[in-house]
Amino acid sequence: MILASKGPFSGNRHRTLVSRLIDELLKKRVTILTADYEGYLKPHRQGRHEPDVVGETSSGLLVIGEAKLCEDLATLHTYEQFSDFSNRAMEDGPLAGRAIPFHIITPMECSPALHSILKDLNLENRDNIHIWLSG
């Protein structure tokens, strides 16, 4: 089922998730290059959509991050994002061809829906997809 609307407070809750994802990536020593968050430049399009966070590891490997609220999971937009972001690979340099890690953060109560969507998209066993649960 594809949903279409967001609640009135979804912007604040989404920003909180983006902040938590940035914090987790920083703990993993990922340098945040761009983020849809105050103090950062907005990320550029990766495929059809802009992710919430783009970072880089010390080896130069890009990292893509996306925050999703429960009500945003079952949308065409999210399906396209997950497909696009999970299938990105490094284009040049010594890491050319290597899959770009894709980090997804969502509230803990959304975990079953997230796993169901990843299964629907045949992404549930991808090594480059990392799930963070908040709350």
Residue ranges of predicted features:
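Short acidic, S/G/P-rich loop/turn micro-motifs used as interaction or catalytic elements
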Residues: 40, 69-74, 108-112
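Active-site metal-binding core of divalent-cation-utilizing nuclease and nuclease-like domains
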Residues: 2-11, 27-59
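Short connector loops at helix/strand junctions that flank enzyme active sites
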Residues: 48-50, 60-64, 97-99
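Conserved catalytic cores of phosphodiester-cleaving nucleases, focusing on short active-site segments
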Residues: 53-79, 85-86
